[in-house]
Amino acid sequence: MSEEVKEQNLPEVEPVQEAASDSVNLDALGDISKVEKLEKELGEITDKYYRANAEFENIKKRYEKEKADVASYANEKFARDLLPVIDALEIAANFDPEDDEFAKKIKEGILITINQFKKCFEKHGVSEIATDADFDPNVHNAVLRVDSEEKQSGQIVQALQKGYMINGRVLRPAMVSVAN
């Protein structure tokens, strides 16, 4: 009788075990979909991390560039304020002392001062705008159009006021006359 009970129990146990293994397989499938979902989330989070990190690096580079620009152009207002001084010195240097020794010494002193100004300007990134080439509206300001036999149309005939740049940026455009 106990054998009969065992035999009767055996077939019943096997289907239960199969059902259990089916549920394990379903659980495993559920775990696999959870793993896939978690892997997808991990991929999205990793992508967001890389994007945020790249954005941070771009902001950092932009900040460094702005910081360098501020340092580079910090003297811009001061240099602009000095331009009328050097203009006045250059006008003073254009006078003809004739035979007056005292006037010659004054002119010599003015020329030395102008050279010191130019060296100081160069040291701080200030340079003169060339006026011996074609007219460039980005750096020249045409105040006159004149007829010229020596220059072609669009070329600068005469510089009326020197222009200056500071580290590649126009500090003051050159005032020029341009050939028709």
Curated annotation (Swiss-Prot):
Record's GO cellular component terms: cytosol
Cellular localization per UniProt: Cytoplasm
GO biological process: protein folding
Major localisation: cytoplasm
Keyword Cytoplasm appears in the UniProt entry: yes
Gene3D superfamilies: 3.90.20.20, Head domain of nucleotide exchange factor GrpE
Subunit structure: Homodimer.
Chain's role: Participates actively in the response to hyperosmotic and heat shock by preventing the aggregation of stress-denatured proteins, in association with DnaK and GrpE. It is the nucleotide exchange factor for DnaK and may function as a thermosensor. Unfolded proteins bind initially to DnaJ; upon interaction with the DnaJ-bound protein, DnaK hydrolyzes its bound ATP, resulting in the formation of a stable complex. GrpE releases ADP from DnaK; ATP binding to DnaK triggers the release of the substrate protein, thus completing the reaction cycle.
Family note: Belongs to the GrpE family.
Protein name per Swiss-Prot or TrEMBL: Protein GrpE
